[in-house]
UniProtKB/Swiss-Prot annotation:
PROSITE patterns: AA_TRNA_LIGASE_II. It is found in: Cytoplasm. This is Serine--tRNA ligase. The keyword ATP-binding applies. GO terms for molecular function: ATP binding; serine-tRNA ligase activity. Its EC number is 6.1.1.11. Consists of two distinct domains, a catalytic core and a N-terminal extension that is involved in tRNA binding. GO terms for biological process: selenocysteine biosynthetic process; seryl-tRNA aminoacylation. Homodimer. The tRNA molecule binds across the dimer. It comes from Tropheryma whipplei (strain TW08/27). Keywords: Aminoacyl-tRNA synthetase, ATP-binding, Cytoplasm, Ligase, Nucleotide-binding, Protein biosynthesis. Catalyzes the attachment of serine to tRNA(Ser). Is also able to aminoacylate tRNA(Sec) with serine, to form the misacylated tRNA L-seryl-tRNA(Sec), which will be further converted into selenocysteinyl-tRNA(Sec).
Length: 417
C-alpha cells in the first residue's frame, strides 16, 4: 500500500498519480473521509475508556450503599465502550480497505498515457534480414518436433503445450544460462512454492483488479503467476539487514496465468499460455536505492538478451499500463520476425515500498529506527524467450542456429530434426 502519511498530508500527489493511471481520483477523498471517521472513532473510544477507568476507581473506593448505582452506571458504560470499540474496528477496516485499493504512486519519470505513449529508451542489435519468408515459432517448433500444441490441448485445453526433445532441451539451456548469470552476479537461488496463501497474494498486489488473472483453488490458496509473489512473502514480518547493500534473489518456478483478459490474442503457439517456466530476479533495497536497483535489474536482462543474440529494445512503460504495485516499469521487447514487430519478453518493475508495507518487510537503520524496504523484480529468463530464439535464428531449411552462449549447454551449433 502507499504511505498513509503521503495520502493524509499531500493528497494531491495521490490524485495526480490516479490521474496519470487513468483511474478515479474520488477514492482519495473517500479514503480521507474514512481516515477522519477513524480518528473520531478512536477519540470516542479512548474518551469512554478514560471514563470507565475513572469509574472503576470510584467504585473501588465507594461505600456499600453507593455501589449498586455505580455498578448500574458501569454496566451501561461498558456497553457504550463495547459499541465504541466495534465502531472503531469498523472504521479501521474501512480505512484499510480503501488504502489497499489505491495503487502505488506513479513515478514522476513515467510517461503519461496508454501503451502507445510508452517511451522507447534504446534499441540494441540488428534486425535479421532473411532472403526467405520467415516462419513463425510454432511452425519451426513443429517441424523440429520441439513444440506440440495439439497434444497440449488434448491433455489440458487451450493455451497448453508440450516442449519435446530439442524444445525441452532449449528451454532448460536458456534457464541454466540465466541461472549461471544470476549466480555469477551474486544472486541467491530459490526454488519457490507455486501455491501461496491469500494474504501473500494480496500483499503483492495481484488481487483486487488483477484477481481474474490468477488461479484460485477451492482451498483458498492461489497458484502464482510469477515467483515474485513467493519471494515477496519470503521475508514478510521480518526486519532485514541491508546495511551492506541490496538482498537479491533469483527464483525459479513454474508459473500459472488465466489470461482471462486476453481472449483471442496470441492464440497460436506459446507466446501467451497458461503455464510456463520463469527465472525471476527480486531485490530488497533501501528506498533511496530503488531507482539505481531498477537500472541494475534491466542491465542483467540486457546481458541475457545479448547472450542469446536477440535484437531488443527497452521501453519506459506509460502510467496507464502499470500494474497495481509498480511505480515505474521497463519492458524489454524482442524482435519477432513473423509478426514484423517488437513483443515484450521480459519486464522490470520498481514497486518502491508498496509491497513491503502490505507484507511488513522492514529494515533497521544505524540509529536503530525501522523503515519499509523497497522491492523490485524483473524476469531473467522465461519460456517466451524460445519464441524469439527460434524466429531470429532460423535458416532457410528450417534449422535453428544456436547462439554461441547456448552451444556448451546444448552440445551443438545447429538444431535440426
Amino acid at each position: 500500500m502507499i504511505d498513509p502519511e503521503i495520502l493524509v498530508n499531500t493528497p494531491d500527489i495521490v490524485r495526480l498519480s490516479q490521474k496519470k493511471r487513468g483511474e478515479s481520483q474520488s477514492i482519495v477523498e473517500d479514503a480521507l473521509i474514512a481516515r477522519r471517521n477513524l480518528r473520531i472513532a478512536i477519540n470516542n473510544f479512548e474518551t469512554l475508556r478514560a471514563e470507565q477507568n475513572v469509574l472503576s476507581k470510584k467504585i473501588a473506593g465507594s461505600e456499600d450503599s453507593d455501589r449498586p448505582e455505580l455498578m448500574r452506571v458501569a454496566n451501561l458504560l461498558a456497553e457504550r465502550v463495547k459499541n465504541a470499540r466495534e465502531e472503531q474496528e469498523k472504521a479501521n477496516s474501512e480505512w484499510k480497505k480503501l488504502l489497499f485499493e489505491i495503487p502505488n504512486i506513479v513515478s514522476s519519470e513515467a510517461p503519461y498515457g496508454v501503451e502507445d505513449k510508452c517511451a522507447v529508451m534504446k534499441t540494441v542489435g540488428d534486425i535479421p534480414e532473411f532472403d526467405f519468408e520467415p516462419a513463425d515459432h510454432l511452425q519451426l517448433g513443429e517441424q523440429l518436433d520441439a513444440i506440440d500444441v495439439s497434444r497440449g490441448v488434448k491433455v489440458s485445453g487451450t493455451r497448453f503445450y508440450f516442449l519435446k526433445g530439442w524444445g525441452a532441451r532449449l528451454e532448460l539451456a536458456v534457464m541454466n544460462l540465466a541461472l549461471d548469470l544470476a549466480l555469477k552476479s551474486g544472486l541467491t537461488l530459490l526454488i519457490t512454492p507455486t501455491l501461496v496463501k491469500p494474504e501473500i497474494m494480496l500483499g503483492t498486489g495481484f488481487l483486487g483488479r488483477h484477481e481474474g488473472e490468477v488461479y484460485r483453488l477451492p482451498s483458498g490458496y492461489y497458484l502464482t503467476g510469477t515467483s515474485e509473489v513467493a519471494i515477496a512473502g519470503y521475508h514478510s514480518d521480518e526486519i532485514l539487514d541491508i546495511s551492506s547493500g541490496p538482498i537479491r534473489y533469483a527464483g525459479w518456478s513454474s508459473c500459472y496465468r488465466r489470461e482471462a483478459g486476453s481472449h483471442g490474442r496470441d492464440t497460436r503457439g506459446i507466446m501467451r499460455v497458461h503455464q510456463f517456466s520463469k527465472l525471476e530476479m527480486f531485490s530488497y533495497v533501501h528506498p533511496q536505492q530503488s531507482t539505481r536497483e531498477l537500472e541494475h535489474i534491466v542491465s542483467m536482462q540486457e546481458k541475457m538478451l545479448n547472450l542469446l543474440e536477440i535484437p531488443y529494445r527497452v521501453s519506459d512503460i506509460a502510467a496507464e499500463e502499470l500494474g497495481t504495485s509498480a511505480s515505474r516499469k521497463y519492458d524489454l521487447e524482442a524482435w519477432i520476425p513473423s509478426q514484423n514487430t517488437w513483443r515484450e519478453v521480459t519486464s522490470a518493475s520498481d514497486c518502491t515500498t508498496f509491497q513491503a508495507r502490505r507484507l511488513n518487510v522492514r529494515y533497521r537503520d544505524e540509529s536503530g529506527r525501522t523503515g519499509y524496504v523497497a522491492t523490485l523484480n524483473g524476469t531473467l529468463a522465461t519460456t517466451r524467450f524460445l519464441v524469439a530464439i527460434l524466429e531470429n535464428h532460423q535458416t532457410s531449411n528450417g534449422s535453428i542456429r544456436v547462439p554461441e552462449a547456448l552451444r556448451p549447454l546444448l552440445g551443438q551449433d545447429v538444431i535440426e530434426r
